[in-house]
Amino acid sequence: MPRIRIAWGSGVAPTEMAAYDAALADANVHNYNLIRVSSVIPADATVSPVDTAPDLGPAGNTLTVVEARGQTAGPGQASAGLAWAPRDGAPGLFYEAADETTPDDVADRVTTGITAGMDVRDWDGVEPSVRTETVTADAGEHAAAVVIAAYGDSDPVFDQ
C-alpha cells in the first residue's frame, strides 16, 4: 500500500530562501526537488504523521508533495497548516493554509477548507487530522514553517 508521510519543520536564517531551506531541512526533505501537486489522496494510500521524514532516496531526486509553507520577515510569526481526511478504499483530501498568523488561525482555516472541499466532492465526512508548525523571526531575520505530505519515495529526475 502506498504511503504518504506528513513531516514538518521550521527555520530561521538571514534570507527568505535560506529560511525556507532550513525549514525543509528540519523536515528532512531539503535534498529533493519538490514537485507540488493538488490535494487528492489516492484511494489506496495510507497517511502517517512522522515529524521528520526518513531517507526517501538519493539527493537530487524528485519528491511529490502537498506543501503548506508560511514565511515572514522579522519581527513576525509565520504558521503553516495541513489537514487530511483519508477515506477507507476511496480517495481522500488534503487542505493547506499558511500565513503570518497564529497556529490556531491556520488550523481553523484548513479545517474549514477541508470540510468545504469534501462537500464540493460529495464525499462522506471524515473527521480531519490537522498538523501546524509555527516559527518566529526577530528583526533582521527571515523565518519559514512547512508542513509537507510526501507521497512515497523519491524518483530520479532523469529517465534511466
Swiss-Prot record:
Cofactor field: pyruvate
Keywords carried by this UniProt record: Decarboxylase, Lyase, Pyruvate
Domain of life: Archaea
Pfam families: PvlArgDC
Catalytic activity: L-arginine + H(+) = agmatine + CO2
Record-listed E.C. numbers: 4.1.1.19
Pyruvic acid (Ser) PTM sites in chain numbering: S39
InterPro entries: Pyr-dep_his/arg-deCO2ase, Pyr-dep_his/arg-deCO2ase_sand, Pyruvoyl-dep_arg_deCO2ase
Family matches, as Gene3D superfamilies: Pyruvoyl-Dependent Histidine Decarboxylase, subunit B
UniProt cofactor note: Binds 1 pyruvoyl group covalently per subunit.
GO biological process, alphabetically ordered: arginine catabolic process
Major enzyme class: lyase
Gene Ontology terms, MF aspect: arginine decarboxylase activity
Site (Cleavage (non-hydrolytic)) residue list: S38, S39
Similarity field: Belongs to the PdaD family.
Protein's recorded name: Pyruvoyl-dependent arginine decarboxylase
Native organism: Halobacterium salinarum (strain ATCC 700922 / JCM 11081 / NRC-1)
Gene assigned in the entry: pdaD
